[in-house]
A protein has these predicted regions:
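Glycine-rich hexapeptide-repeat left-handed beta-helix
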Residues: 1-4, 18-19, 26-127
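Short, flexible active-site loops
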Residues: 14, 22
Length: 127
């Protein structure tokens, strides 16, 4: 028992890369978590921060506001520019819009399922 909350909190305009693992951590608004990253228990990523792909944030580590971190374990790389912090929410919105465009490509039965349903309806077949 660590005394840390067992929940993971992700706030608005956050981009989490594919295959990332988030364990009882907090990600404040407008952050980017690179793909294949791991955030351990009690870690905190503050507003306007970026964690590079493949990074590992140890338990209890805090990534301060406006910083870029990378590596295993994650270490400070540099401070983000004002322009970079302005682009973070724009990226989140763009990815969300793109996901809506491709939503039907990831059905559990593939898109063939939709074609079969249309054909069954056209032929009057009920199952």
């Amino acid at each position: 028992m660590s005394g840390l909350p067992a929940e993971t909190s992700i706030e608005r305009y956050v981009t989490v890369g594919a295959y990332s693992l988030l364990r009882s951590c907090t990600i404040e608004p407008e952050c980017i978590i690179g793909q294949h990253s791991i955030l351990m228990e009690g870690s905190l990523v503050e507003t306007h921060s970026i964690l590079e792909a493949g990074s590992v944030v140890p338990p209890g580590r805090r990534i301060p506001t406006g910083e870029l971190w990378a590596g295993n374990p994650a270490r400070f790389v540099r401070t983000l520019t004002h322009e970079e912090t302005l682009e973070i929410p724009k990226l989140a919105v763009a990815i969300n819009d793109l996901s809506k465009t491709h939503f039907f490509e990831f059905l559990p039965y593939s898109t063939v399922y939709l074609e079969v349903e249309k054909l069954k309806k056209k032929l009057g077949i009920s199952v």
